From Swiss-Prot:
It is found in: Cytoplasm. Substrate binds at H158, E167, E293, D318, S370, H371, R372, S373, K394. GO terms for cellular component: cytosol; phosphopyruvate hydratase complex. Expressed in the brain and, to much less but significant extents, in the pituitary and adrenal glands. The keyword 4Fe-4S does not apply. The active site is at E210 (proton donor), K343 (proton acceptor). Belongs to the enolase family. This is Gamma-enolase.
Length: 434
C-alpha cells in the first residue's frame, strides 16, 4: 500500500563512479533500485545531478541527489499516502515538485531511483512478477522475450583504441529461444576472442566498459570483418545479424565528421554526412548489418531523414531522441529514424519511459531497450523489455557481471513463463506480429 520509508545512498557503478541507490519500504518489505549512468550522453538528456566537488570522486559525487531524496522527495511521498501501485501519480508528484523541464532541480538520477523502487514495490504489492506489473502499467497483455544485441567490439568513447564507431553488436535472430540466443552469443564471443588474440596479440583481448573487446584498430570495416570471421568460425552465419552504434555526435566537427577523432585534430580529413552515409551503405552491402544507431549528429536532422529514406534497415535514434517525447515527435514528423533506443535514465521516470515507448510503437517504430555504459547489478531493464514487448535489448557483451545480471534475469523470466514464453527472433523489429 503506502510507502513507509525511503532511504537513498551513494554507491559505485561499474566504472567506479558514484551513483544513486534507493531503498523503499512498505509493509511487504524493502525494495531496492540503483541508477545507471552514460559515457556518451546526448545533450538533450534529462540532467544527471553531480556534486562537482573536485575534492570528492573528481567532482562526480551524487550526495546532492541523495540529499534531495532523503530530505525532500521521501517525506513528500510518505506523507502523500499514495499507494505504490499508483506509479503515475507518484512519478507526477516528483515531476511537479521538481518543476523543471529537464529535472535539473532534483536530478533525473534522484527521481529515477525512487521511480524504479516504487515500481518494484508495486509488483510486490500486487503479488505479481515485476515484468507483469510493468506490462499492466503499459496496458500490455502480451509478454515477449527480446533478441539480445551483444556489444562485442567497443570503440568511440567507450574504448582507448583508435576506432571511431562506438559499438559493433551481434544479434542472434535465428535462435530458437532467449536461452539459445545467449548460448550463440557467448560462443561467438569466445570465437571472437581467439580471432582477436591471433591477429593482434593477447593484450588486444582486454575488455571495455561494456564487456566487449577493444583491439587497436582504426578502420571500422576491420571490426565488421572480425565479427564476420568469428560468426563463421562459430558456425552461425545464418543465425546472426550485425548491429552498430556509431554515436556520431562524438566525432561531429563543424558540420562534418572525423573518423579519426582520437588522433590530433586535422580538418582536412573530415568527411561530409553524404560521404558517411555512403560508407554505411557499403557496410550494409558487404556485411549482414541490419541496424545502425546514431549514424549522424543529434542535430543533423537532414542527414538522418535522407539516410533513413534510402535504406531498408533499422535506424535507431539515441542521442537524437534521448527517450524524450518531444524529440520523438519531431523525429516521427521528419522521418528521421524508425526505431527508438529506450534508456530509462535519459528521461528519468518509469511513467515517462513507458509513454516514450508507446509513442514510438504507435508510430510504427521499433524500440530497443538499453543499459548505460556505467551500470549496476540492478536488473530492472530485463523485466522492462519483456513487459513492453519491444523485441530487442542491448546490455553489453556476455561478459562482466553488471551486464550478465540483466541477461541472466531474462533467462529466468523465460523459464518462469514456460510454454507461454515467446522469443522475438527474426521479428525483433516488429514483435507485435508474433
Amino acid at each position: 500500500m503506502a510507502v513507509e520509508r525511503i532511504h537513498a545512498r551513494e554507491i559505485l557503478d561499474s566504472r567506479g563512479n558514484p551513483t544513486v541507490e534507493v531503498d523503499l519500504y512498505t509493509h511487504k518489505g524493502m525494495f531496492r533500485a540503483a541508477v545507471p549512468s552514460g559515457a556518451s550522453t546526448g545533450i538533450y538528456e534529462a540532467l544527471e545531478l553531480r556534486d562537482n566537488d573536485k575534492s570528492r570522486f573528481l567532482g562526480k559525487g551524487v550526495l546532492q541527489a541523495v540529499d534531495h531524496i532523503n530530505s525532500t522527495v521521501a517525506p513528500a511521498i510518505v506523507g502523500s499516502g499514495l499507494s505504490v501501485v499508483d506509479q503515475e501519480k507518484i512519478d507526477n508528484l516528483m515531476l511537479e515538485m521538481d518543476g523543471t523541464e529537464n529535472k535539473s532541480k532534483f536530478g533525473a538520477n534522484a527521481i529515477l531511483g525512487v521511480s524504479l523502487a516504487v515500481c518494484k514495490a508495486g509488483a510486490a504489492e500486487k503479488d505479481v512478477p515485476l515484468y507483469r506489473h510493468i506490462a499492466d502499467l503499459a496496458g500490455n497483455s502480451d509478454l515477449i522475450l527480446p533478441v539480445p544485441a551483444f556489444n562485442v567490439i567497443n570503440g568511440g568513447s567507450h574504448a582507448g583504441n583508435k576506432l571511431a564507431m562506438q559499438e559493433f553488436m551481434i544479434l542472434p535472430v535465428g535462435a530458437e529461444s532467449f536461452r539459445d540466443a545467449m548460448r550463440i552469443g557467448a560462443e561467438v564471443y569466445h570465437n571472437l576472442k581467439s580471432v582477436i588474440k591471433e591477429k593482434y596479440g593477447k593484450d588486444a583481448t582486454n575488455v571495455g566498459d561494456e564487456g566487449g573487446f577493444a583491439p587497436n584498430i582504426l578502420e571500422n570495416s576491420e571490426a565488421l570483418e572480425l565479427l564476420k570471421e568469428a560468426i563463421d568460425k562459430a558456425g552461425y552465419t545464418d543465425k546472426i545479424v550485425i548491429g552498430m552504434d556509431v554515436a556520431a555526435s562524438e566525432f561531429y566537427r563543424d558540420g562534418k565528421y572525423d573518423l579519426d577523432f582520437k588522433s590530433p585534430d586535422d580538418p582536412s580529413r573530415y568527411i561530409s554526412a553524404d560521404e558517411l552515409g555512403d560508407l554505411y551503405q557499403s557496410f550494409v552491402r558487404a556485411y549482414p548489418v541490419l541496424s545502425i544507431e546514431d549514424p549522424f549528429d543529434q542535430d543533423d536532422w537532414e542527414a538522418w531523414s535522407k539516410f533513413t529514406a534510402n535504406v531498408g534497415i533499422q535506424i535507431v535514434g539515441d542521442d537524437l531522441t534521448v527517450t524524450n517525447p518531444k524529440r520523438i515527435e519531431r523525429a516521427v514528423e521528419e522521418k528521421a529514424c524508425n526505431c527508438l533506443l529506450l534508456k530509462v535514465n535519459q528521461i528519468g521516470s518509469v511513467t515517462e519511459a513507458i509513454q516514450a515507448c508507446k509513442l514510438a510503437q504507435e508510430n510504427g517504430w521499433g524500440v530497443m531497450v538499453s543499459h548505460r555504459s556505467g551500470e549496476t547489478e540492478d536488473t530492472f531493464i530485463a523485466d522492462l523489455v519483456v513487459a513492453l514487448c519491444t523485441g530487442q535489448i542491448k546490455t553489453g557483451a556476455p561478459c562482466r557481471s553488471e551486464r550478465l545480471a540483466k541477461y541472466n534475469q531474462l533467462m529466468r523470466i523465460e523459464e518462469e513463463l514456460g510454454d507461454e514464453a515467446r522469443f522475438a527472433g527474426h521479428n525483433f523489429r516488429n514483435p507485435s506480429v508474433l
